[in-house]
A protein has these predicted regions:
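Residues on the lipid-exposed face of transmembrane beta-strands in outer-membrane beta-barrel proteins
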Residues: 85-91, 144-150, 187-193, 257-263, ...
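Outer-envelope beta-barrel architecture signal
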Residues: 52-58, 95-101, 155-159, 196-200, ...
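Outer-membrane beta-barrel "beta-signal"
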Residues: 24, 508-520
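Residues that define the transmembrane beta-barrel architecture of outer-membrane proteins
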Residues: 79-85, 138-144, 179-187, 251-257, ...
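Transmembrane beta-strands of outer-membrane beta-barrel pores
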Residues: 62-68, 105-109, 152, 165-169, ...
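Long, internal scaffold/assembly segments composed of regular secondary structure
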Residues: 237-387
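Outer-membrane beta-barrel translocator domains and adjoining extracellular loop/strand segments
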Residues: 70-75, 112-118, 170-178, 213-219, ...
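N-terminal, post-signal peptide beta-strand-biased segments of exported outer-membrane/organellar beta-barrel
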Residues: 18-111, 125
Length: 520
């Protein structure tokens, strides 16, 4: 039924675009050009959709991928097989509106994963749970984005709004069996004001994320298994049969705002954005038990530039930086049982006895640089060459007694792509190296189960420098189905990461995939 619905969505999108689009068939080179020419591409401000000057176009595909190898962290698992359907489209709706839509459905299975039953085990809320027994996990995710923006109205004003909606399901297939479900939505209204070639934009958003584990079950009740509750770094409490009656909810409310400025003309356009967001995430168990509360503050900067030095060359320069501070207040609570004397019924609640402010702390810093030189011909990009660089710094701390985990790395990648539209062939290659600049682990108690089975083994991965490469080959061919002519494609791709020697052995991680789809 799901596949039938997906095919119906694809056919509808193709039909809409075919009726509105009279230009030549979309191909990979033209697709790259449409996504590269405007600095406002990828903006969180939906009011900027009309600034991107897009024709009606999109793509849809099915994808299968396999990931494996021995270069992985404990909570990631060693192998993953995944099936995906993806489609996105840009459309002009009537005279006054532009729209963007995206639908992404994927399902997969991960093997030999342990020590986490939630979707965010790293650098986030520390109050999660898991089993130390390796198991397979099945997951399904649905990601929807819908954005609409007006043309310029009322002497320079544009208006828009965007909705992001995500559903997730993560199920453990071995005792103790958990099922984590995710509902995440984000609403972002936005406006821009233009005067001459200058554009100023404002956007604000509300993001609600709820992940919950309703129950943890067992099939084999003859043996009790240890289930762990985590509190940050090595601090995890395991109890025999601890999964019995376990339930937990993580509910986050985030408010954010961004201010953007852009300059727009044919030869040069740019967009610069600064943003700030605050999140407040409650953690709730049975009878509203709260092990703690997690807060985040995020500050981000993005600047994108597009410059045409001639009719046949287009330069892209993208800069991005983000700094996140998170901390958790840890609670000590006591169960209070109250009996109604008239009915004999009991009511339950937890009263807070003690609060450890900012007991767990995390800071994240990311900086990214991307430059790409594009050759342009007939509104296509037949060739590009570029360089990407990134810096990442992570710091986790748990207080009283103090434990820390710190790591950082620098990644430099070269890229090159060719689109031969006359024969329908495209290829992309990337070669890079990620250098580990720091990895330290200092634990107050390194003898705990979580330290011995997760943190200490992970340090080999976090401290490893490695080379990585990516290769993509695509073949495109026009196909007519019921009078609708579209460019169909088949794409094969793969990437490989090889580490420096760890204990006299080089670890490897690979991904291979195959996609079949169409441009429209």
């Amino acid at each position: 039924m799901m596949i039938k619905n997906i095919l119906s969505i694809t056919a509808m999108l193709v039909a809409i675009t075919a009726s509105a689009q009279n230009d030549s068939l979309m191909n990979q080179g033209r697709y790259d050009y449409e996504l590269s020419k405007s600095a406002w591409q990828g903006s969180n401000n939906a009011a900027s959709l009309s600034l991107q000057n897009h024709i009606n176009f999109g793509k849809a595909y099915f994808n299968y991928s396999h990931k494996g190898g021995d270069f992985y962290r404990v909570q990631e698992g060693d192998m993953n097989n995944r099936l995906q359907f993806f489609t996105e489209s840009w459309q002009k709706l009537g005279k006054y509106l532009y729209a963007y839509g995206k639908f992404d459905f994927n399902t997969g299975r991960t093997k030999n994963r342990s020590w986490t039953d939630v979707m965010r085990p790293y650098n986030s809320n520390p109050y999660f749970s898991g089993s130390g027994i390796k198991a397979s996990y099945e997951e399904q995710n649905i990601n929807l984005t819908a954005a609409i923006g007006s043309v310029e109205l009322m002497n320079g004003w544009r208006f828009g709004a965007k909705l992001d909606y995500n559903l997730g399901d993560l199920s453990r297939l071995r005792d103790p069996r958990s099922r984590s479900q995710l509902l995440n939505y984000k609403l972002t209204p936005a406006i821009t004001y233009s005067t001459g070639n200058n554009i100023i934009g404002i956007a604000g958003w509300y993001n609600r994320r709820k992940e919950k584990i309703s129950n943890v079950t067992t099939v084999d009740n003859t043996t009790k298994k240890i289930y762990y509750l985590m509190y940050g770094l090595e601090n995890a409490v395991g109890s025999m049969g601890g999964s019995s009656g376990y339930q937990r909810e993580w509910v986050n409310h985030e408010f954010g705002a961004e201010l953007s400025y852009g300059y727009n003309n044919y030869n040069y356009n740019n967009m610069t954005v600064v943003s700030i967001a605050r999140g407040s995430e409650g953690v709730y168990g049975q009878y509203k038990y709260q092990p703690g509360h997690y807060y985040t503050y995020n500050y981000a900067f993005k600047s994108q530039h597009r410059y045409r030095s001639s009719e046949t060359t287009l330069h892209q320069l993208d800069l991005y930086g983000s700094y996140t501070e998170g901390y958790a207040n840890e609670y000590r609570q006591q169960l209070v049982v109250t009996t109604d004397p008239s009915t004999g019924y009991n009511s339950y609640r937890y009263d807070n006895q003690l609060t450890y402010n900012k007991r767990y702390q995390v800071t994240l810093f990311d900086a990214n640089f991307h430059y790409r030189f594009n050759k342009v011909a007939n509104k296509e990009i037949p060739m590009f060459v570029g360089i990407l660089a990134s810096l990442k710094q992570v710091n986790n701390k748990y207080l009283l007694n103090t434990s820390t985990l710190k790591y950082s790395n620098v990644d430099v990648t070269l890229e090159n792509g060719w689109n031969f539209s006359n024969i329908g062939f495209s290829t992309t290659i990337q070669l890079g190296y990620k250098n580990s600049t720091k990895s330290t682990l200092e634990l107050a108690d390194p003898s705990t189960d979580y330290a011995q089975n997760v943190l200490i083994p992970d340090m080999d991965i976090l401290g490893a420098s490695y080379a990585h490469g990516y290769l993509e080959l695509m073949y495109q061919r026009p196909v007519s189905i019921k009078g609708m002519r579209s460019n169909w494609f088949i794409k094969g791709y793969g990437n490989l990461a090889i580490s420096k020697k760890i204990n006299d052995e080089r670890l490897k991680r690979h991904t291979i995939g195959l996609s079949i789809g169409l441009f429209y």
